[in-house]
């Protein structure tokens, strides 16, 4: 809950994005230094955390991605996965399974975003993902982030490129 409050222009961009894509408006928004990509955190009252460097220039497709995580309660799922890992700290299969579930969650969020985007917006979405590929934000416990580690980016970009072509 630390960080600066969202600026009026950022709040307005979030409101317009939620309205455009018929998604719930994110009420709690913080601007934070020292992070590279936006992410959601908090189970009961999720907070959208936006990097200070992106506060005024954040793309609506990035907001769309994070709002889709919010709509589908991905922060709670991510927390439960971390809890499962903590309780099964001795079992490498659980770590592997949780990583697969997190990667699939990101892929599903990408698919949901692509279903709402049209034409050139889909290519731009893939480019945004590439720009965020080297983020370290996604590894924080209890968060969701558009960037989910460089290993998974190649697969996600391939899925974005194939979106709509594969039955």
Q: What is the meaning of each model-derived region?
A:
Residues 1-167:
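Hydrophobic topogenic segments
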């Amino acid at each position: 809950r630390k960080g600066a409050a969202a600026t009026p222009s950022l709040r307005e961009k979030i409101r317009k994005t939620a309205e455009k894509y018929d998604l719930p408006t994110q009420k709690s928004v913080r601007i934070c230094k020292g992070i590279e990509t936006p992410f959601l955190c908090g189970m009961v009252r999720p907070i959208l955390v936006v990097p200070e460097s992106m506060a005024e220039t954040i793309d609506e497709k990035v907001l769309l991605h994070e709002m889709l995580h919010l709509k589908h309660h991905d922060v709670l799922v991510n927390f439960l996965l971390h809890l499962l890992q903590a309780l099964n700290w001795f079992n490498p299969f659980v770590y592997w399974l949780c990583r697969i579930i997190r990667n699939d969650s990101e892929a599903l969020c990408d698919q949901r975003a692509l279903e709402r985007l049209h034409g050139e917006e889909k290519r731009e979405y893939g480019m945004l993902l590439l720009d965020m590929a080297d983020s370290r934000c996604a590894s924080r416990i209890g968060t969701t982030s558009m960037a989910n580690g460089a290993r998974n980016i190649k697969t996600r970009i391939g899925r974005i490129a194939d979106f709509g072509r594969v039955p």
